[in-house]
């Protein structure tokens, strides 16, 4: 099951999930991409998103406005839907309308093999890495996440480090091995690091839970601001989004 948490009043870009992306609302684009891989449900917090999804025949459930993270919203949706404890759950974002089918499939495969949870990352350049909106991740020898940050990690002290360690940009999608894992993660107390960085995935690392990271090729960009949206609409074309 794929769940897309969608909040109307995003702090940096209100109503962004309803913004038009070449004739379709952003959240609808995201859901249509997800439906190419598995059954998808939008977990929304407002009737306007619910009605938009219904208009385009996208399955949706109405959840609380008071969740601290998309993961918490996914859990409520999973409970509403009555998912079994052993069902695998993917958490995609409502602001990734350009996410490729191949990336979702890669996440699904990584989740099958991950004991706790999985996510994806892609190689980025130094200029991209400067943006705090693009989260960076560093990995251990088994491609599990060591840390996620809005800052530049690792810091490239020497020129040779550029060749030895590629910079990795996190793609904010998650796979939970089963619903019980999702329950376990949400039951953990929020940690200081996630509050400082505003990155919910740091909770798992703080409590020594493994996050497997699949490195993929992707041109997708997350839409965090109005500027992100305008830039993306210049880069992508309607033909590119046709599946």
Swiss-Prot record:
EC numbers: 2.7.7.38
Q: Which reaction does it catalyse?
A: 3-deoxy-alpha-D-manno-oct-2-ulosonate + CTP = CMP-3-deoxy-beta-D-manno-octulosonate + diphosphate
InterPro entries (UniProt xref): Cytidylyl_trans, KdsB, Nucleotide-diphossugar_trans
GO CC terms of this entry: cytosol
Primary residence: cytoplasm
Catalytic EC class: transferase
What the entry lists under Gene3D superfamilies is as follows: Spore Coat Polysaccharide Biosynthesis Protein SpsA, Chain A (3.90.550.10)
Tell me the route in metabolism or biology where this protein functions: Nucleotide-sugar biosynthesis; CMP-3-deoxy-D-manno-octulosonate biosynthesis; CMP-3-deoxy-D-manno-octulosonate from 3-deoxy-D-manno-octulosonate and CTP: step 1/1; Bacterial outer membrane biogenesis; lipopolysaccharide biosynthesis
Look up the record and give one Gene Ontology term from the biological process aspect.
Answer: lipopolysaccharide biosynthetic process
Q: Which domain of life is it from?
A: Bacteria
Location within or outside the cell: Cytoplasm
Key words, A-Z: Cytoplasm, Lipopolysaccharide biosynthesis, Nucleotidyltransferase, Transferase
Record-level Gene Ontology MF annotations? 3-deoxy-manno-octulosonate cytidylyltransferase activity
Q: Which family does it belong to?
A: Belongs to the KdsB family.
HAMAP family linked to this entry: KdsB (MF_00057)
Q: What does this protein do?
A: Activates KDO (a required 8-carbon sugar) for incorporation into bacterial lipopolysaccharide in Gram-negative bacteria.
Q: Indicate what this protein is called per its UniProt record.
A: 3-deoxy-manno-octulosonate cytidylyltransferase
Report the gene name: kdsB
């Amino acid at each position: 099951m794929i769940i897309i948490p969608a909040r109307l009043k995003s702090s940096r870009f209100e109503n962004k999930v309803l913004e038009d992306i070449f004739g379709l609302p952003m959240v609808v684009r995201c859901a249509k991409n997800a439906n190419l891989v598995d059954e998808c449900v939008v977990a929304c917090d407002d009737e306007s998103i619910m009605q938009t999804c219904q208009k385009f025949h996208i399955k949706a459930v109405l959840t609380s406005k008071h969740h601290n993270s998309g993961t918490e919203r996914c859990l409520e949706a999973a409970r509403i839907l009555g998912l079994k404890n052993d069902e695998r759950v993917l958490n995609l974002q409502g602001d990734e309308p350009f996410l490729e089918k191949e990336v979702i499939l890669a996440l699904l495969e990584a989740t099958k093999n991950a004991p706790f949870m999985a996510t994806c990352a892609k190689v980025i350049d130094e200029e991209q890495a400067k943006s705090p909106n693009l989260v960076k991740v560093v990995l251990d020898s088994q491609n599990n996440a060591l840390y996620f940050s809005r800052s530049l990690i690792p810091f490239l002290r020497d020129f040779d480090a550029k060749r030895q360690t590629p910079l990795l940009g996190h793609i904010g999608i998650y796979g939970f091995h089963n619903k019980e894992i999702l329950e376990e993660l949400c039951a953990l107390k929020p940690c200081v690091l996630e509050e400082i960085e505003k990155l919910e995935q740091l909770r798992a690392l703080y409590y020594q839970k493994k996050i497997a990271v699949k490195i993929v090729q992707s041109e997708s960009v997350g839409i965090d601001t109005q500027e992100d949206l305008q830039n993306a609409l210049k880069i992508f074309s309607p033909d590119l989004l046709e599946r």
